[in-house]
Amino acid sequence: MSTPKFRPLKFGVTRVNMREGTSGVRYMLADQPLEDFATRMTDRLVHWATTKPDATMLAKRVKNADGSLGDWRHISYAQAWQSARAIAQALIDRGLNAERPVVIMSENDLEHALLSVGCLVAGVPFCAASPAYSTISQDFEKLRHILTTLTPGLVFAADAKRYGKAIEAAVGKDIEVVLHSGEITGRATTPFESLLATPATPAVDAAMQATGPDTIAKFLFTSGSTKLPKAVINTQRMWCANQQQMAQSMPVLAETPPVLVDWLPWNHTFGGNHNFGMVLYHGGTL
């Protein structure tokens, strides 16, 4: 029987200070202060695209026509930054903002990731809607609720075949639909590649610099287990501060860039904030 291999890990925060409040409330505070953190998550993307441009940020196995898995498709930090700038310009050209954000109707995917960072660069909030609301639901009630709540200016879906029915049922004709693959009969759509082909201008840099700690990065919706899902605003400060908390609690993240095999859905805070953010913040690979 082989001996299990263990890796020694250093934990940064192991103790807390507690004080008694009123009405039985107790307050706990880590025994070390929170250090300075990035102003915006895109600062980290720029940092890694500059310091290690060829390192893999994202990777996915290509699915062959017969359903088997082929080679890995890699996207480096430099490529992600270039793609994010192009997408950001496309979003700026469309006048999207917090009142007209981006809704993503797709599972975790490379295009989903690139669109997300493009939104961050442009300062346009995005929302990853639970794929189940589009692929399992028969009445699309929760999807309609998300669209009504956010009033998006653009909706993205990776696959027309998988998401076409939900788009036809819930997405208004006045909302631009961007598809990575396929077409929807009788409806004009925009290919995702056209966003990637948009030439970036100085407006992209200006838009990113205009974002700050209180800029809305994304909307996450609660699970809707008992009632309709509720939109939760996630600001740049919230996301960056949380990543710094994680970095101080788990110093190993700064010692070795994390490599994650990820399946947790990005419409949930664990997958979309914890894991995706951890990789981006520390120059890892997802």
Feature-to-residue mapping (PLM):
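AMP-dependent adenylate-forming
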Residues: 15-29, 44-76, 217
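A short helix-loop-beta submotif of the ANL/AMP-binding
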Residues: 88, 109-134, 145-154, 258-259, ...
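Conserved AMP-binding/adenylate-forming core of the ANL superfamily
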Residues: 33, 57-117, 134-142, 192-200, ...
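Conserved ATP-dependent adenylate/AMP-binding module captured primarily in the ANL superfamily
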Residues: 133-168, 199-201, 242-261
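Conserved AMP-binding
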Residues: 106-110, 130, 263-269
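Conserved pre-ATP/AMP-binding loop-to-beta segment of ANL
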Residues: 53-56, 180, 186-221, 227-228, ...
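Conserved AMP-binding/adenylation subdomain of ANL enzymes
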Residues: 240-259, 266-286
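Short beta-strand elements of ligand-binding domains
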Residues: 106, 175-185
